[in-house]
């Protein structure tokens, strides 16, 4: 499978710092690499780029342990990641996220729906944006790395696309 070979070559790790085993490069270099992959197959480039995009919030704001855990998961080719921001009610306006996350003991309970999520059907980790404090505006928006095996998580709709059919675009709940 081309994706497994790409993972072995490190094409899924342009955003992951070298200290975590990645091939971190500057943004311009990463974009040239994605563009070159896209000449071969746009779907292929999209899977690689979306996986890197989904890791970005944890790379920016996660603890070293979180970065290590999720980076290792991706680097070892254990699965794909998806980036879930877009919602039916607010589009991709990050300041108007309707999905909520409420702390319940040691866990967070996330409620809401995301739509048009690339890799959503294949991903085993989804970066989900949710409002944790509606009174705090954009500072009350948090990103959660959610395993798709989490009870209550589901793919609710697959989009019937005219192109890019190798990977899914779907709604998640």
Language-model-derived ranges and their functions:
Residues 10, 17, 33, 63, ...:
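Buried hydrophobic positions in well-ordered alpha/beta secondary-structure cores of metabolic enzymes
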Residues 56-61, 83-84, 95:
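Flexible, glycine-rich active-site loops centered on histidine and acidic residues
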Residues 77-85:
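A short, Trp-centered hydrophobic/proline-enriched beta-strand micro-motif
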Residues 107, 111-155:
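A short core secondary-structure module
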Residues 48, 89-92, 116-119, 133-135, ...:
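Short Gly/Pro-enriched turn/cap motifs at secondary-structure boundaries
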Residues 4-78, 118-125, 136-137:
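Internal helix-loop-helix
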Residues 93-111:
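Cytochrome P450 C-terminal beta-domain/meander region
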Residues 96-98, 149-173:
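Flexible, small-/acidic-enriched active-site or ligand-binding loops
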């Amino acid at each position: 499978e081309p994706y497994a070979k790409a993972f072995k070559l490190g094409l899924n790790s342009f955003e992951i710092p070298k200290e975590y085993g990645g091939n971190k490069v500057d943004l311009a270099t990463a974009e040239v690499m994605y563009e070159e992959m896209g000449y071969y197959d746009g779907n292929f480039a999209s899977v690689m780029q979306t996986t890197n995009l989904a890791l970005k919030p944890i790379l920016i704001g996660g603890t070293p342990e979180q970065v290590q855990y999720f980076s290792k998961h991706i680097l070892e080719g254990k699965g794909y990641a998806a980036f879930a921001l877009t919602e039916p009610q607010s589009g991709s306006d990050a300041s108007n996220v309707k999905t909520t996350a409420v702390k319940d003991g040691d866990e967070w309970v996330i409620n809401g729906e995301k739509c048009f999520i690339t890799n959503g059907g294949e991903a085993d980790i989804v970066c989900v944006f949710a409002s944790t404090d509606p009174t705090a505006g954009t500072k009350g928006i948090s990103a959660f790395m959610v395993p798709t095996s989490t009870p209550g998580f589901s793919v609710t709709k697959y989009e019937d696309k005219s192109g890019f059919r190798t990977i899914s675009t779907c709604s998640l709940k």
